[in-house]
């Protein structure tokens, strides 16, 4: 059995760890989830609760669950191709093997409109010889198109969340004016009612369930 080269293995680990934060933001479900959670917090009106660390932790845990099948496929591909190539090219071979599961995930969840935009943009701003070799399923196209698709979807969800809570704000503001309490800030009075509605509807479960199932 061939023993793995320690130097090559260490280099692979360092490169993977360096790319991990970037990959978590652009080729996983993390971006959409953390943006939706942030918009929810703003819509309720509690700016610091949950704190940013908690929101990011929840988004990371949910993203790990969503991306687990992709990660397992990437790990399997890397294990199968570990011995391939020379010591100098082994990192390239492993990265090439790992990218296919992520590429398939991006293909499935990227809007055609965004892919078409980046393909057209490449024709306009790239050198002609480079643009001619670019394909719509290349990571250079899929990564930005996927990120833009995720942000668009996140803001759509945030818009719907805001609509629900704005209704409560309007009702509370009108009620305070009718009682002659125009000096009272409607936002502060509305927060308990927003929290009550959110808890009564089991809002956390509904929101997280919906986000997870959006990646079916």
Curated annotation (Swiss-Prot):
The chain crosses the membrane at residues 6-26, 55-75, 157-177, 193-213. PROSITE patterns: FLIP_1, FLIP_2. It is a multi-pass membrane protein. The keyword Chloroplast does not apply. It is found in: Cell membrane. The keyword Transport does not apply. InterPro entries: T3SS_IM_P (IPR005838), T3SS_YscR-like (IPR005773). It comes from the Bacteria. Its main location: membrane. GO terms for biological process: protein secretion. GO terms for cellular component: plasma membrane. Keywords: Cell membrane, Membrane, Transmembrane, Transmembrane helix, Virulence. Belongs to the FliP/MopC/SpaP family. Important for pathogenicity. This is Pathogenicity-related ORF2. It comes from Xanthomonas campestris pv. glycines.
């Amino acid at each position: 059995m061939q023993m793995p080269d320690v130097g090559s293995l260490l280099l692979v680990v360092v490169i993977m760890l360096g790319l991990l934060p970037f990959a978590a933001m652009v080729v996983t479900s993390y971006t959409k989830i953390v943006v939706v959670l942030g918009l929810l917090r703003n819509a309720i009106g509690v700016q610091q609760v949950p704190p940013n660390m908690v929101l990011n932790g929840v988004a990371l845990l949910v993203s790990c669950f969503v991306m687990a099948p992709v990660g397992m496929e990437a790990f399997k591909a890397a294990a199968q191709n570990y011995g391939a190539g020379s010591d100098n090219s082994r990192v390239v071979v492993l990265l090439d093997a790992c990218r296919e599961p992520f590429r398939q995930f991006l293909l499935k969840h990227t809007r055609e409109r965004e892919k078409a935009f980046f393909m057209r943009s490449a024709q306009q701003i790239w050198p002609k010889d480079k643009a001619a070799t670019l394909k719509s399923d290349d990571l250079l196209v899929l990564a930005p198109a996927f990120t833009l698709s995720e942000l668009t979807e996140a803001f759509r969800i945030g818009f719907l969340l805001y609509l629900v809570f704005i209704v409560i704000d309007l009702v509370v503001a009108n009620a305070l004016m009718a009682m002659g309490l125009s000096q009272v800030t409607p936002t502060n009075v509305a927060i308990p009612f927003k929290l009550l509605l959110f808890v009564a509807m089991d809002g956390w479960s509904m929101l997280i369930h919906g986000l997870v199932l959006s990646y079916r």
